[in-house]
């Protein structure tokens, strides 16, 4: 089989692709590795277009290039340079008024807008940049032009090499999103390579076949397949599924930050025990799901979470026996943009809602345990609440949405009916919950599609630097870390962060 690997993703993501490439090369596959060669000049790692980051990235590629077996051939995008095409692309005029317009932008029938927006938002966490400011538009236009040129080069190399399968990181960010679209257009098999930290901090690599890792239907099918594996007993599946939820509620590490760390058990809002019914809203980090794809956009009833929360508060404003509590996601506590700061003002606008800030020590799990209804926007607190036999109303895309464990209204009218129904019961589907828990618990321990990613971390001038297997300069990891540290201090282009008023 002929595999085409795109290492054009910057540090540290290229390390995931390199390890995966080595794995398949040792199986005897014919491997073509595509390196950027400093040709594009902008990616998630280098949004400020710092030429020294490009230099270090190229050095990084050359390290693992020298260690690859003979059946791995490297091709550089720089070798495909076409100045005439680049000059032609730079003349393209993009017409957009909002970031939602940018999502829809295509080049030669290939969407480049989602990759642009996803990468920008991942870097800045700004969901609404002021594209009317001239220098903001110049920055975004330049990024879009680079993505057009990158797409041109990607198609050119795929057409030339005619691979059976292509590999790239994640599928969401700018270097890879167009590859998803190209693969679909050409009916070509593709693999999204993803990294994950499992229990105990072990870094591993997971592959997602012909789907992005965020695809809800695909992930549901994986959960069903894991559950249907007859090599594992039903008893063990149930034990592992229950263990996942038990560990989560006890603050055990599951690959992401521990967002309940520092929260105080039994600490609750002052008005918690006033005899009213308690409906608790857990919002999510809206920026994390903002530009994954149209699948998530279509799942939403409301354009923004704050619109949804206001709708809920207004719907229940005259039900004096119901108190609303909004727990702002801890990951938003340092965000200065209005999609977070406006949430903090909701108690001034609606008398029936108590806002609990992201940095509050109030216990999220105690809020969940004492709630009569839980409303979520796709967060894992939704499935955890369902496991605790709570009524859960989910208003966004979620990996548990198609497991039939939460109420998933499709319209505002559906939502109103769920909010005002005093006889609503929790959905009784323990097996669906255990499928979810077993999937993630098994992946964390014994998943056969995982293989380890070698890395260590060092402290340098109070900064933690992750050093992977191929992070070396002149054979030295320390020298790589030192150069990386000082390059990060160098200023490239200013990344615009102004929010539209």
Where are these regions (language model features)?
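A short, glycine/small-residue-rich beta-strand->loop->alpha-helix junction that serves as a flexible
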Residues: 7-17, 168, 289-293
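Histidine-anchored nucleotide/phosphate-binding helix
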Residues: 11-28, 32-33, 180, 301-317
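Conserved N-terminal ligand/cofactor-binding loop architecture of enzyme catalytic domains
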Residues: 29-148, 195-259, 455-461, 470-501
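Conserved nucleotide-sugar donor-interacting segment of glycosyltransferase catalytic cores
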Residues: 150-206
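Conserved catalytic-core segment of nucleotide-activated headgroup transferases in glycan assembly
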Residues: 248-344
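Long, C-terminal catalytic modules of enzymes
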Residues: 275, 405, 409-501
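Nucleotide-activated donor-binding/catalytic signature segment of Leloir-type glycosyltransferases, i.e.
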Residues: 341-358
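A donor-sugar binding/catalytic signature common to diverse glycosyltransferases
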Residues: 360-407
């Amino acid at each position: 089989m002929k595999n085409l690997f795109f290492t054009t993703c910057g540090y540290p993501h290229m390390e995931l692709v390199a390890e995966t490439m080595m794995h398949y090369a040792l199986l005897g596959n014919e491997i073509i590795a595509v390196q950027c060669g400093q040709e594009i000049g902008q990616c998630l790692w280098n949004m400020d277009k710092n030429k020294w980051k490009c230099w270090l990235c190229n050095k990084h590629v050359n390290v693992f290039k020298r260690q690859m077996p003979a059946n791995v051939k490297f091709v550089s995008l720089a070798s495909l340079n076409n100045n005439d095409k680049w000059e032609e692309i730079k003349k393209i005029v993009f017409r957009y008024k909002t970031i939602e317009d940018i999502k829809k932008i295509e080049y030669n029938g290939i969407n480049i807008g989602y990759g642009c927006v996803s990468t920008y938002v991942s870097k800045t966490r700004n969901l609404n940049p002021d594209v009317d400011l001239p220098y903001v538009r110049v920055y975004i236009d330049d990024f879009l032009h680079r993505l057009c040129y990158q797409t041109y080069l990607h198609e050119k190399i795929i057409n030339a090499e005619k691979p059976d399968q292509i590999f790239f990181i994640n599928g969401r960010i700018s270097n890879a999103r167009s590859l998803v679209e190209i693969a679909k257009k050409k009916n070509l098999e593709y693999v999204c390579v993803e990294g994950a930290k499992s229990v105990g901090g072990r870094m591993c690599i997971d592959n997602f076949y012909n789907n992005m890792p965020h695809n809800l239907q695909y992930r549901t099918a994986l959960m069903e397949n894991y559950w249907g594996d007859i090599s594992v007993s039903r008893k063990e599946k149930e034990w592992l599924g229950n263990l996942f939820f038990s560990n989560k509620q006890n603050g055990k590490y599951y690959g992401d930050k521990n967002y309940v760390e520092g929260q105080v058990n039994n600490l609750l809002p002052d008005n918690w025990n006033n005899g009213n019914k308690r409906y608790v809203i857990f919002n999510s980090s809206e920026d994390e799901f903002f530009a994954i794809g149209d699948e998530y956009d279509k799942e939403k009833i409301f354009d923004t979470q704050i619109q949804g929360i206001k709708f809920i508060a207004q719907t229940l404003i005259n039900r004096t026996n119901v108190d609303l509590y909004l727990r702002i996601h801890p990951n938003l506590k340092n965000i200065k943009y209005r999609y977070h700061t406006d949430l903090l003002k909701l108690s001034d606008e609606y008398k029936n809602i108590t806002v609990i800030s992201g940095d509050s020590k109030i216990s999220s799990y105690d809020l969940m345990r004492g709630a009569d209804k839980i409303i979520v926007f796709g967060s894992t607190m939704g499935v955890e609440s369902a496991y605790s036999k709570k009524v859960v109303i989910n208003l966004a895309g979620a990996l548990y949405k198609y497991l039939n464990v939460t109420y998933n209204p499709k319209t505002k009218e559906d939502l109103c009916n769920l909010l005002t129904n005093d006889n609503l019961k929790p959905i009784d589907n323990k097996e669906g919950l255990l499928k979810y828990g077993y999937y993630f618990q098994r992946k964390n321990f014994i998943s056969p599609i995982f293989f380890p990613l070698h890395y260590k971390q060092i402290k340098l001038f109070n900064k933690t630097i992750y050093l992977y297997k191929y992070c070396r300069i002149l054979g030295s990891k320390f020298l790589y870390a030192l150069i990386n540290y000082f390059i990060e201090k160098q200023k490239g282009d200013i990344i615009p962060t102004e929010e539209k008023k």
